Amino acid sequence: MAKVSSSLLKFAIVLILVLSMSAIISAKCIKNGKGCREDQGPPFCCSGFCYRQVGWARGYCKNR
């Protein structure tokens, strides 16, 4: 019974680590509708596209 509990605990720890890493990675990008500048460095848009028209100082993130 102790082996089942320790392997379940290990699985839970790994699962928590993976979920927290994915949350950190996704937090490093700008969500759609938020302001962005494609000519500056990170963070970049999560969608990979910063819509900006001529004359605008900043654009906003959106899907293509």
Curated annotation (Swiss-Prot):
Major place of residence: secreted
Subcellular compartments: Secreted
Keyword set, alphabetical order: Antibiotic, Antimicrobial, Disulfide bond, Fungicide, Knottin, Plant defense, Secreted, Signal
PROSITE patterns given in the database record: PLANT_C6_AMP
The keyword Secreted belongs to this UniProt entry's keyword annotation: yes
SUPFAM superfamilies: Gurmarin-like
GO biological process: defense response to bacterium; defense response to fungus; killing of cells of another organism
Membrane-spanning residues: none
Signal peptide per UniProt: 1-26
Gene Ontology annotations for the cellular component aspect, listed alphabetically: extracellular region
UniProt KW Chaperone keyword: no
A Pfam family of this chain: Antifungal_pept
Cysteine-cysteine disulfides: C29-C46, C36-C50, C45-C61
InterPro entries: Antimicrobial_C6_CS (IPR013006), Gurmarin/antifun_pep (IPR009101), Gurmarin/antimicrobial_peptd (IPR024206)
Protein task: Possesses antifungal and antibacterial activity.
Record text about domains: The presence of a 'disulfide through disulfide knot' structurally defines this protein as a knottin.
Family as reported in the entry's similarity comment: Belongs to the AMP family.
Name the record gives this protein: Antimicrobial peptide 1
Lineage, highest ranks first: Eukaryota, Viridiplantae, Streptophyta, Embryophyta, Tracheophyta
